[in-house]
Regions:
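DNA major-groove recognition helix of helix-turn-helix/homeodomain DNA-binding modules
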Residues: 60-75
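N-terminal flexible/basic segments that precede or flank functional cores
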Residues: 1-24, 28-29
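Recognition helix of helix-turn-helix/homeodomain-like DNA-binding domains
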Residues: 41-55
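Short basic helix-loop element that most often maps to the first helix and adjoining turn
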Residues: 20-35, 39, 64
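Short acidic/histidine-centered micro-motifs embedded in hydrophobic/aromatic stretches
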Residues: 79
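Conserved hydrophobic/aromatic packing and binding residues within compact polymer-binding modules
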Residues: 22, 36-37, 47-50, 76
């Protein structure tokens, strides 16, 4: 079984990588979680869960985050 893979949660690795990428882009843009959450019109606690890989988010939220980060959606998947 690949590292980071769990039969209970087969997408755990990808969620973590997505969250790390969002955090990296946020840090690179000099934004706090609160700042990005405000720009993306999402709850800061939900953003924290996304960045930590704890939730399966939706395309809607990924679009909001990309807009808040001022990057194309595909940039969120460049990990």
């Amino acid at each position: 079984m690949p590292v980071g893979y769990s039969s209970d949660n087969p997408f755990q690795r990808e969620r973590k990588l997505l969250g790390q990428t969002i955090k990296h882009l946020r840090d690179k843009g000099g934004m706090t979680q609160e700042g990005l959450a405000e720009k993306a019109s999402i709850n800061v606690s939900y953003l924290a869960k996304i960045e930590n890989g704890y939730v399966n988010t939706t395309v809607r939220y990924l679009i909001k985050l990309a807009r808040g980060l001022k990057v194309p959606v595909k940039a969120l998947f460049e990990f």
